Structures are given as structure tokens and as C-alpha cells.
């Protein structure tokens, strides 16, 4: 009868007798399992683990797919204020339905004034999500209707800004200098909303409290809100979408005359899918990369076990000769592999725990649900299961190789060292070839990403980020209720900033490059859009003169804005090159006219006075698109919408300073100027434009670093595999080498012979690796920029690198082979 503990004791004793082999195998596998477990922790926390809400599978987003735009195609489109109210009232597929939007506030009344991220939410949103507060309560429908000034804090805000005070309920705070009362604190796990694919850590929540303007007929075309609902039991997404479309048809029938051309189609997506939409490709690529590293580590382990089995051929032959069952030998081989793998798995779990804690700081800020990334029991279970499965399969090859041992031949050979057998050699060579192939796939991917990043750094941004410092301020509506008050503050601030030592140019804007963009609808005089009326969209920016000089945006035609472009002068606009080429191809845009709004809107015409270069509004790898600029001083006459304060947030502007002085010095000077004008006004997001551009490149940089790290690990493991097989081959062919030298072969010939064997393996592996790299092109394509997935330069360099490393891995065994003493080796024979 089989005694498993006897087998285990035997295996442990044999491993203790080979400490070098055991340590090498365990640590090599620990690296592979540790890396895989760490990445699985991220995938589990972000992709696999359910959202921290009640029955999250019933949660869906509801948004508009707007004809003629890409809204709602792959993400939840925005909705309008009137739609939120109508969908809540008229749809029947949802248990509950709520709306929300992000907001920024000046928080004061506790410590230093600060600009915070917040959210306006309908009270039903808390019901939809099914999360109760940790302390206190959430706001009610009555408070929402009565516009009660109450706030619910996030756990992080409660801890950081209120020191976790258990008596925080009832505390009065100021939001945009209006008094609010704290009525609740949400649990630590409550993180909502996450701006889809972007960093958005909400610090507090306030009632939506729609204003009259937000529910007026004019607001029917103001898309800025998001909606989330909980489906009724048994209701499918398709049924919910059909229900919402019936309501949308009624909404469109009630559109005002100037909005009759709009067509909306409500779309419903699972909330879980949307939360991780933009991170899914990245995490999938990470998981594939780490799986490749684990595969190489497993191949190396299998190779080491195979070498160990070959060296134990005489022992195995003796045991088989005295009647040991073949199944028992196979079982012990597999058990030995499993023991090594479990030991590697336990060490790998420790490495993964360290990697998860350390790696959180390296993860891109665009990754949602970072707080959910932990090494929990499910992840530990995954690691141990992975270790057992890895050990089982890695033990099969040496186990079956041992069973094929020729008992008579092995016993006749006695203790002599000779060839390990063609079959065994081919199996070891196959493992190394596969290692080289997958390493080359990763190395090629790394090279393509590095080349893409290099290409992106060479892109003409359309502006000069060097020596530019930016900052944001937001004027609260209570103190700055009119455009005249806003203009006065902006003018005084700009005058003082321009007087600072070292300032070469100073301007202001509602948006800066490399931070994203918004869109607005407009009409170009004499232009008929082939897509139909009200389909022309562009990114608007309201600016204060000297913005272009401060940002370094070149003027191509016409002129920049001046101080004379105020509310009493002709309405003017500056367009970018892409805008001019699209609407006036081959023409001079100067003197052309456009206006914001729709065809039937009564907004005034603006005259084009300048054309500037295309400034990259998103990351450098994003395509340029139409953009126009208008003076802040003319905002009320232009459209009355862009930089106007609302009941909830003031006029938010970026300061843009070009100076030869160090950024730290400029930051202190800017803060002092703002504090002098308004001691309570916080200045936020103070950074250089170089930092802003670097942040926009962060996702691509992260991809490149991660894949390059895995590629390096894979190549090193493959080199180790080449070294081990060549070293063993040399050790098993000592007599052959001695005979060759005894018959007249030069030592240089022996070196070439050994090195050539390594290069042959590398050549076959590279052929397979290049084929694998071509097959992986589909996965890589979306991560590349102006680089072909089959870039010959990258593939040639990666192949040469693998050959060079293979040659280096073969060098030491080759030198050892050449240093064999023929007389001593033959005497041993």
C-alpha cells in the first residue's frame, strides 16, 4: 500500500542533499509565481471582484447615444437635466434610477482653504447603490427639492480633513463660501463616482438640487450628467434599453424648435464593465506578459528536473531492477516537482505581497478601484493552486523520461558519464527553444513600445511646454456673481502676475493642452455639414490675451487677441489649423464667421481674426481636432455659457506663466499674489507644463516600463536556460571533447562547436519567436503609435540581442570545454 508521507520524506531528504539545485529551482519558480500572483491581485481587484455595492450585477448605466457623435458608442453617454427627471419618472424597468455629475468646490471653514473634488447626486443614487453611511445619514428627496445645503463626507475626507472625529455630524463647513452642514460619512469601500477610466476620487457628496436653468427647455441640449440604475428582477439590459427608448421618443417630441435636429438613443451598459472599460486592454496585456514569464520559469524548472533525472539514471535503473513500480517512480518525480513548486509558491506569495504594496505607487492613476487591490485569500488560493498545477506539469517530463530509462544500459555504464541520450537532449533543447521564442515575443513587444514612446516624444505638440508654469483657481459665485466682478478680479490678478520678476508672458484660459477637452456645437456661415444640421462640433477655450504667447502656440495667420477685444467690441474668435482646413479648405479663414449653438439658435456671429497651430489637447499620440478660442471678456455676448459661474461653482481658470525662473520660485510667487488679492482663494494644480505633458504620457510610459521589465525577466530566464543546457551538454560530453582534442582538434574548434550549439537553439527559437511576435501584433496594435507591429528595425534588433545573449550564455561552458585535459578525461573513461 502506498504511503504518501514516506514518499514526501524521501523527496525532502533528496532535495536536502542537493541544496544548490533546490535553491535554484525554488527561487526561479518563486519569481515566476510571485510576479503572476501580484498581477493577478491587480486583475482580481480591478476586473474580477464585484463592485462594493449591493447586488452589483443589477447595476447599469443609462446614457444617450447622440446621432452624429461618438457619445454612447462604447461608454455611457451623458444625459441632460430634464432627461434625468423624465427617465426617473417615466421608465419602468428600474427599481431605482439616479443621476450625478462631478463638481469642484472651494472647501473652507476647516484648516486651510482647499479645492476639492465632489459630486452632485440625486438622493436616489444612494438607494440605487444600496450602501448605507458609516456615520449619520444621506440626504433626502425633500432636502434635494428644498435645496438644503447638506453634505456627506467620504471616509478619506473624514479621516484626513476631520481627523476621524466621531462627532463630525452637524459640523458646519463652507463650500464656495456657502454654509453646509455635514450629515453623514460613507464607508471606506464606497468610491463613487469613478470618472470612467480617469482618476476621480470624490471627497464629498451634495444634493443635486437642480436649478431652474438646469431644467429649462434650453437645458434639453446640455449634456453633462451621468445616470446609474438598478434593474428590476428578471429585467434584461435589452428590455431596459427598449423601455428608455420609448421615453426618449417622448423627450424628443418635446424638444424646443432649435433642438429638433437632435436624435438620441438611450444605451444601457453594466456598471462593472464601464468601471474597467479603459483598463481592460492594459490588464489583459499585463496578464499575458506575466503568464509568459511564468511559462519560461516552468520550462526552466522542467529542464532542471530533467537534468536531475538524467543524472539519477543509475539510481533509477537500480530501483527498477529490484522491482520498484514505474508508477511509484513517476509519483515521486511529480511529488518532488510539486514540493519545489509549493515552496516557490510560498516564497512567491511573500514576494507578491511586497510587490502589491510597493506597486500601488507605480500603478497609473487612471486605474480604478486601486483600494480593492489586496493580497486576499482568493489571491493566496490562486497562488497555491498555481504552484501545485505548475509542479504537477513540470514533473511530468522528467517523470516520463525516467520511466524510459534503459535499465541494462544504465547498469552497464556504471558510474561513467556519457551522453544523456538523444531523446532527453531533444526534450531539453525543445524547452530552451520555447523559452527563447516567448522571450523574443516579449522583447519585441518591449522594443515596439519603446519605439512608440520615442516617436511620441518627437511629436510636435503645437505649443512649447518648457519654462511654463500653470495653476488653477475657481471664483466662488457668492463673492463673484457677475461677469464684471470676474473680469475685474482676472484683470487685477493678471496685472500683478505680469509684474513678477522673470515673467515673460502671462495669460489665462479655461482649458490647457494635454488635459482633455470638451466639445460644443456651432454653426459656420455658408458651410453645409453633410452629416446634417447641428453636427459641427469643436473644442472651445475661453482665453485672456497673452495666453498664446505664454503657452507658446504659434500664430499662422492673422493676429492674437488684444485687450481691445472686450465686451464693447466686435466679437472675435481664433481657430486652429485643423478647424480652418476642415471648414475653409484652401482658403484664408481670416474674416470668416461662425457662432456657437445650433442652426436655429439666436447667438451672435463671431469673426475669425487668427489661425494658430494645432495644440494637442489630450496626449501627444491623440489626433488633433477642431478647436476655437474666444476672449473671456466677450463670454456673455458669445454664448453666455462657457466661463459663467453657476449656483454651485465659480468661474474656473488656468493661469499660464512663461518664465525663465525655477518653477518652485514661480509657485511661491503665484500663491503670494493670489493670497494678496483674496486670502481665502486656494490655488490648486500648480505644476509645469512639462509635468502636465508627462502625466498625459503616463499610461503609455507605464505600459512600456511594465512590458520591458517582463521582457528583461523573460530574456534573463531564457539565457539561464541556454546556459544550463549547454553546461550540462558539456559536462556529459567531456570524453567526446577529450577524444576530439586527442585526435588533433584545436581548442578554438571546441569553443566554436559548443558556442554553435547554443546559437542553433537561439536561431530556432528566434524563428518561432518572430512568428509569435507577428501573431501577437493584434494585441499590441492599440498600444502603438506611428510604429508598425511588424517594424523591421525592432525585430532585427531584438533578434540580434537574443543571439548576443545566447552567445554570452554559451561562452562560459565553451571555455570550460576547451580547458578539458584530454589525458585526465580519457583516464577517467
Q: What are the functions of these language-model segments?
A:
Residues 5, 10, 36-167, 174-181, ...:
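Structured, solvent-exposed hinge/loop segments at the ends of secondary-structure elements
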Residues 88, 183-192, 208-280, 492-506, ...:
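"Rare, low-scoring activations can occur
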Residues 43-59, 65-68, 191, 198-213, ...:
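Short juxtamembrane loops and helix-capping segments at transmembrane helix boundaries
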Residues 1-22, 271-276, 304-331, 335, ...:
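Alpha-helical transmembrane segments of integral membrane proteins
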Residues 19-46, 50, 296-299, 341-345, ...:
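Short, strongly hydrophobic transmembrane alpha-helices
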Residues 297-341, 720-762, 766, 813-816, ...:
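Interfacial "coupling" helices/loops that link adjacent transmembrane helices in transporter permeases
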Residues 276-293, 378-382, 697-714, 756, ...:
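N-terminal membrane-entry
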Residues 39-42, 302, 338-410, 451, ...:
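Small-residue-rich transmembrane alpha-helices
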Amino acid at each position: 500500500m502506498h504511503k504518501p508521507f514516506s514518499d514526501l520524506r524521501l523527496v525532502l531528504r533528496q532535495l536536502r542533499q542537493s541544496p544548490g539545485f533546490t535553491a535554484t529551482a525554488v527561487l526561479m519558480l518563486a519569481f515566476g509565481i510571485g510576479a503572476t500572483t501580484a498581477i493577478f491581485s491587480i486583475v482580481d481587484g480591478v476586473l474580477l471582484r464585484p463592485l462594493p455595492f449591493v447586488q452589483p450585477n443589477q447595476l447599469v448605466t443609462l446614457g444617450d447615444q447622440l446621432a452624429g457623435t461618438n457619445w454612447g458608442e462604447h461608454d455611457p453617454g451623458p444625459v441632460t437635466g430634464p432627461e434625468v427627471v423624465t427617465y426617473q419618472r417615466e421608465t419602468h424597468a428600474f427599481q431605482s434610477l439616479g443621476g450625478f455629475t462631478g463638481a469642484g468646490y472651494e472647501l473652507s471653514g476647516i484648516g486651510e482653504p482647499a479645492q476639492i473634488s465632489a459630486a452632485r447626486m440625486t438622493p436616489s443614487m444612494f438607494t440605487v447603490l444600496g450602501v448605507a453611511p458609516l456615520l449619520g445619514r444621506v440626504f433626502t428627496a425633500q432636502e434635494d427639492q428644498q435645496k438644503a445645503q447638506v453634505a456627506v463626507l467620504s471616509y478619506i475626507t473624514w479621516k484626513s480633513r476631520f481627523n476621524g472625529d466621531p462627532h463630525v455630524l452637524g459640523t458646519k463647513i463652507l463650500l464656495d463660501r456657502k454654509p453646509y452642514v455635514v450629515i453623514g460619512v460613507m464607508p471606506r469601500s464606497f468610491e463613487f463616482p469613478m470618472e470612467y477610466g480617469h482618476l476621480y476620487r470624490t471627497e464629498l457628496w451634495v444634493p443635486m438640487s437642480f436649478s431652474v436653468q438646469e431644467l429649462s427647455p434650453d437645458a434639453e441640449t446640455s449634456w453633462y450628467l451621468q445616470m446609474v440604475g438598478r434593474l428590476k428582477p428578471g429585467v434584461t439590459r435589452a428590455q431596459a434599453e427598449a423601455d428608455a427608448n420609448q421615453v426618449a421618443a417622448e423627450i424628443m417630441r418635446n424638444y424646443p424648435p432649435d433642438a429638433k435636429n437632435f436624435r438620441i438613443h438611450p444605451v444601457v451598459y453594466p456598471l462593472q464593465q464601464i468601471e474597467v472599460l479603459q483598463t481592460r486592454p492594459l490588464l489583459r496585456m499585463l496578464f499575458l506578459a506575466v503568464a509568459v514569464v511564468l511559462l519560461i520559469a516552468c520550462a526552466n524548472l522542467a529542464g532542471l528536473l530533467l537534468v536531475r533525472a538524467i543524472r539519477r539514471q543509475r539510481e533509477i535503473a537500480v530501483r527498477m531492477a529490484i522491482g520498484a513500480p514505474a508508477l511509484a517512480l513517476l509519483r515521486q518525480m511529480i511529488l518532488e516537482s510539486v514540493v519545489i513548486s509549493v515552496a516557490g509558491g510560498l516564497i512567491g506569495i511573500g514576494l507578491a505581497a511586497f510587490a502589491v504594496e510597493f506597486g500601488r505607487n507605480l500603478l497609473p492613476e487612471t486605474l480604478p478601484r486601486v483600494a480593492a487591490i489586496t493580497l486576499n485569500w482568493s489571491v493566496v488560493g490562486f497562488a497555491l493552486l498555481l504552484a501545485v498545477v505548475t509542479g504537477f506539469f513540470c514533473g511530468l517530463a522528467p517523470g516520463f523520461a525516467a520511466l524510459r530509462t534503459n535499465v541494462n544500459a544504465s547498469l552497464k555504464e556504471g558510474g561513467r558519464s556519457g551522453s544523456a541520450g538523444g531523446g532527453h537532449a531533444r526534450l531539453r533543447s525543445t524547452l530552451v527553444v520555447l523559452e527563447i521564442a516567448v522571450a523574443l515575443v516579449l522583447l519585441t513587444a518591449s522594443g515596439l513600445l519603446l519605439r512608440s514612446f520615442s516617436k511620441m516624444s518627437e511629436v510636435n505638440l503645437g505649443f512649447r511646454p518648457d519654462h511654463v508654469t500653470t495653476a488653477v483657481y475657481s471664483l466662488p459665485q457668492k463673492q463673484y456673481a457677475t461677469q464684471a466682478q470676474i473680469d475685474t478680479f482676472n484683470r487685477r490678478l493678471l496685472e500683478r502676475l505680469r509684474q513678477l520678476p522673470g515673467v515673460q508672458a502671462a495669460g489665462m484660459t479655461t482649458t490647457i493642452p494635454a488635459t482633455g477637452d470638451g466639445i460644443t456645437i456651432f454653426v459656420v456661415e455658408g458651410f453645409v455639414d453633410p452629416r446634417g444640421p447641428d453636427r459641427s462640433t469643436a473644442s472651445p477655450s475661453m482665453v485672456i490675451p497673452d495666453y498664446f504667447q505664454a503657452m507658446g502656440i504659434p500664430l499662422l495667420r492673422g493676429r492674437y487677441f488684444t485687450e481691445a477685444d472686450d465686451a464693447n467690441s466686435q466679437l472675435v474668435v481664433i481657430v486652429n489649423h485643423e478647424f480652418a482646413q476642415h471648414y475653409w479648405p484652401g482658403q484664408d479663414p481670416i474674416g470668416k464667421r461662425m457662432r456657437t449653438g445650433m442652426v436655429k439658435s439666436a447667438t451672435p456671429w463671431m469673426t475669425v481674426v487668427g489661425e494658430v497651430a494645432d495644440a494637442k489637447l489630450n496626449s501627444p499620440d491623440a489626433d488633433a481636432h477642431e478647436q476655437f478660442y474666444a476672449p473671456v471678456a466677450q463670454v456673455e455676448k458669445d454664448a453666455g455659457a462657457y466661463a459663467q459661474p453657476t449656483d454651485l461653482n465659480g468661474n474656473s481658470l488656468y493661469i499660464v506663466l512663461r518664465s525663465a525662473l525655477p518653477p518652485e520660485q514661480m509657485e511661491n510667487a503665484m500663491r503670494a499674489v493670489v493670497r494678496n488679492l483674496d486670502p481665502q482663494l486656494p490655488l490648486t494644480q500648480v505644476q509645469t507644463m512639462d509635468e502636465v505633458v508627462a502625466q498625459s504620457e503616463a499610461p503609455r510610459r507605464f505600459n512600456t516600463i511594465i512590458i520591458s521589465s517582463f521582457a528583461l525577466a523573460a530574456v534573463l530566464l531564457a539565457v539561464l536556460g541556454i546556459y544550463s543546457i549547454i553546461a550540462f551538454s558539456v559536462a556529459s560530453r567531456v570524453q567526446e571533447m577529450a577524444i576530439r582534442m586527442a585526435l588533433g582538434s584545436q581548442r578554438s574548434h571546441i569553443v566554436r562547436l559548443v558556442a554553435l550549439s547554443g546559437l542553433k537553439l537561439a536561431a530556432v527559437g528566434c524563428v518561432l519567436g518572430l512568428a509569435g511576435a507577428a501573431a501577437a501584433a493584434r494585441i499590441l496594435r492599440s498600444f502603438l503609435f506611428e510604429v508598425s507591429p511588424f517594424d523591421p528595425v525592432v525585430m532585427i534588433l531584438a533578434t540580434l540581442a537574443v543571439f548576443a545573449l545566447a552567445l554570452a550564455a554559451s561562452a562560459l561552458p565553451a571555455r570550460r570545454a576547451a580547458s578539458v585535459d584530454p589525458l585526465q578525461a580519457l583516464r577517467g573513461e
